[in-house]
C-alpha cells in the first residue's frame, strides 16, 4: 500500500535481520534526496528473543552522508549563463532547506543582485524580508513576482521540480514562459531535472556545495559583482504595496475574524524563531503568501501530496 510513496519498504520476518534492516533504512532515508522509508514489523516479532550482539554489528553512529558536488564543467556553464543574463531569476525550492544552503543562496543572489522567487516548500530558504526575495510563485503567487519570472531570460531552478501548484499548472505565460526563458536546473535527484520544463543545463548535486562552486566561478567572470539598486527599489515598493493592500482587512474587527487579522495578531506575539506548521487549505497558502518567515527551517508546509491533518500530527512529532 505504501510502496509508491516511500523510497523502500521492508517487512521484518526474521527477528535477527531487524538490526540490519533498521541500519539500511536510516541510511537510505538520509542519502541522496531525503525521503521516507517503511519498516513493517509484525507484532509477533516483538515477543521473540534475539542475540543482543546483533545490534553491535550495525553501524551505529557511523552514518556519514556524502554530499556530491556538481560536475565542474556544469558549474562553470551555469555561472557563465548567470553572469551574461540580463534578467535572471533564482527559483528556490525545498531542496535549499534540505541541503541547508540558505547562506550560499543569499551569497550568490547578493553578489549578482539576482531576484529570488520560491516555491511553497521553499519558504524560509531566504528571509521573506530580504531585499532580493520576490516571493512565492504559482497559484498563490503575486502579480509582481510573476512579472519577473515570466520575463526572465534565465531561470536557475534550485531544489525544485517546478511542480504544478508552483507553476500555475504550467499554463504558459502565467508563472513561467519557456518561449522567453532558458531554464537551468540543479537537483540532488536526477529524475527531477527537466521533468516539467526543458533545461539547457541540468546538473545533479548537493546545493550547498554546488552553489559555492557556482559563486566561485561567477567571481572569476565578474570580479566586482553587480549592483542593481533599481531592481531592489522595485521589489521594496511591491512589498510595501502588498502590505498596504492588506492593511484594512488585517485590522478588521468583524466577527467571525478574517484570516488576515489572525495572521497579523499571531505575528505580533510569536517569537521570530518559533517553529510553525501549517495544514491544508487557506492556512497553508495564506501563511506562505502573507506571513513573513525570516529564519530558515522555521516553517513547514504539507506540500507535495498536501496531506490533510499534517499540521497537528507534525506539531506532536
Predicted regions and their residues:
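N-terminal alpha/beta PP-like core and its mobile active-site loop of ThDP/TPP-dependent enzymes
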Residues: 1-227, 237, 265, 269-272
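Small-residue hotspot
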Residues: 25, 315-317
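Active-site diphosphate/adenylate-binding microenvironment
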Residues: 237-315
Amino acid at each position: 500500500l505504501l510502496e509508491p510513496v516511500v523510497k523502500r519498504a521492508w517487512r521484518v520476518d526474521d527477528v535477527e535481520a531487524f538490526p540490519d534492516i533498521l541500519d539500511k533504512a536510516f541510511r537510505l532515508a538520509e542519502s541522496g534526496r531525503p525521503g521516507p522509508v517503511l519498516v513493517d514489523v509484525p507484532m509477533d516479532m516483538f515477543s521473540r528473543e534475539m542475540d543482543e550482539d546483533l545490534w553491535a554489528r550495525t553501524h551505529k553512529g557511523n552514518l556519514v552522508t556524502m554530499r556530491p558536488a556538481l560536475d565542474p564543467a556544469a558549474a562553470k556553464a551555469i555561472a557563465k549563463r548567470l553572469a551574461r543574463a540580463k534578467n535572471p531569476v533564482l527559483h528556490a525550492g525545498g531542496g535549499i532547506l534540505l541541503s541547508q544552503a540558505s547562506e550560499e543562496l543569499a551569497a550568490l543572489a547578493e553578489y549578482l543582485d539576482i531576484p529570488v522567487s520560491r516555491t511553497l516548500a521553499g519558504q524560509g530558504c531566504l528571509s521573506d524580508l530580504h531585499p532580493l526575495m520576490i516571493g512565492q510563485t504559482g497559484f498563490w503567487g503575486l502579480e509582481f513576482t510573476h512579472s519577473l519570472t515570466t520575463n526572465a531570460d534565465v531561470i536557475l531552478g534550485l531544489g525544485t521540480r517546478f511542480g504544478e501548484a508552483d507553476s500555475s499548472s504550467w499554463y504558459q505565460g502565467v508563472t513561467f514562459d519557456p518561449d522567453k526563458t532558458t531554464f537551468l536546473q540543479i537537483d540532488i535527484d536526477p529524475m527531477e531535472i527537466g521533468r516539467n520544463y526543458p533545461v539547457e543545463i541540468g546538473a545533479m548535486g548537493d546545493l550547498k556545495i554546488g552553489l559555492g562552486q557556482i559563486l566561485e566561478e561567477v567571481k572569476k567572470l565578474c570580479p566586482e559583482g553587480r549592483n542593481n539598486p533599481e531592481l531592489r527599489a522595485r521589489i521594496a515598493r511591491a512589498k510595501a504595496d502588498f502590505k498596504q493592500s492588506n492593511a484594512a482587512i488585517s485590522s478588521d474587527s468583524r466577527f467571525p475574524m478574517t484570516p488576515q487579522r489572525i495572521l497579523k495578531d499571531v505575528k505580533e506575539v510569536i517569537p521570530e524563531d518559533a517553529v510553525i506548521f501549517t495544514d491544508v487549505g487557506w492556512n497553508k497558502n495564506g501563511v506562505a503568501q502573507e506571513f513573513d518567515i525570516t529564519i530558515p527551517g522555521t516553517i513547514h508546509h504539507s506540500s507535495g501530496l498536501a496531506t490533510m491533518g499534517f499540521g497537528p500530527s507534525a506539531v506532536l512529532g
